[in-house]
Design a protein with these regions (language model features):
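Exposed, interaction-prone extracellular/peripheral surfaces
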Residues: 1-51, 57-71, 75, 84-120, ...
């Protein structure tokens, strides 16, 4: 379900879009620093539960305590006793970001649009993982293809990446006659990250995860297998970006909906209560489809909405993950839903 209202909504902060990229960057840095104050000096593992990322031998598997995905199959085969890989926290962490900048992210009816919220999430991840020589790289998926930013350390590199994301031209606005040819999709982008992220670390995927969702919820999305492959090697955080108008339609009469990927248009009478109910039910089923796919892949799920306090949501997530990381062995250590 990628239909969007044809009219461009007015953001809650109309001055933001009029600022230069450098001024927007300074405002974003200040906002992230204020909202995440007290967490910025924590260890990177606060983003996700569990151990670090450097191998440190193997030990016998303890049912109920260990994650099956850390099974050391080579040692298990050699000893005929199940073993898991032990890992120690890295002195230096490499984080890879996959940022979805496809046309479906160019939408918003609340405090931020989806693209701006995605950049805020990238900034939060960058500042939370910065320091001690940690490196940050990115793959940006846009309508013109996949653009790679090599992994480097330092605040200057992070700010340069954020400046690039803020200054990138807006995608979408097509009609059915000028849609560009199809480029890489989310599954392709995940595979690209898998190829460049050769050292075990942290992978953060920021997307609405709408790409290729099948109509049949029993079918897995085309990107699920690639996400699962990443989660075998890395700790993976899936940041899902949504807008309230993607979840329910207001009763505002006749509107024109536009598919931002194809330019297709459809007029809809929102005064039809049954139509609004069907829309809301379909949208809820779609979000559940994404949630289940992320869970099955082994990634941690962090949903963010344009109409919520994203800073508070990230803080709650980080604190919950730190509690999980500090829980004694044998306690319930399930990831965030």
């Amino acid at each position: 379900m990628r239909w969007r209202e044809a009219t461009t909504p007015t953001p809650a902060d109309p001055g933001l879009a009029d600022l230069t990229p450098d001024r927007r960057l300074r405002r974003l840095e200040l906002t992230v620093t204020r909202r995440l104050d007290g967490l910025l000096h924590g260890q990177y593992r606060g983003l996700l539960p569990g151990p670090g990322s450097e191998p440190a031998g193997s030990r016998e598997y303890r049912p109920g305590e260990d994650e099956v995905r850390r099974m050391d199959w080579a040692v298990t085969a050699r000893t005929t006793v199940p073993h898991v890989r032990e890992v120690d926290a890295d002195r230096e962490l490499t984080t890879w970001l996959l940022v979805d900048a496809s046309p479906s992210m160019e939408y918003g009816t609340a405090e931020l649009d989806k693209r701006e919220l995605a950049v805020a999430a990238v900034a939060a991840v960058g500042f939370l993982t910065a320091g001690l020589g940690n490196r940050l790289g990115a793959q940006v998926l846009g309508p013109d293809g996949l653009r790679r930013h090599p992994a480097r350390s330092g605040r200057t590199h992070l700010l340069g990446l954020l400046r690039t994301l803020l200054a990138a031209p807006r995608a979408g606005g097509y009609d059915e006659t000028d849609v560009p040819p199809a480029g890489p999709d989310l599954a392709d982008a995940l595979d690209a990250v898998h190829r460049v992220a050769t050292r075990r670390g942290l992978v953060v995927v920021v997307s609405d995860f709408l790409d290729g969702l099948p109509d049949d919820p029993a079918q897995e999305p085309p990107w699920e297998r690639a996400l699962r492959r990443l989660a075998v090697r890395h700790q993976v955080l899936a940041v899902e970006i949504t807008d309230p108008r993607e979840l329910e339609l207001p009763d505002v009469g006749l509107i024109t909906l536009v598919d931002p990927e194809t330019g297709r248009r459809r007029e809809v009478w929102t005064g039809d209560e049954r139509l609004r109910e069907r829309y809301a039910a379909a949208a809820a089923a779609q979000r559940e489809q994404v949630r289940q796919a992320v869970r099955r892949s082994g990634a941690t799920h962090l949903p963010l909405r344009t109409d919520r306090d994203w800073g508070a949501d990230i803080v709650r997530h980080v604190r919950a993950q730190r509690r999980l990381a500090a829980a004694p062995a044998g306690a319930n250590r399930g990831g965030a839903a």
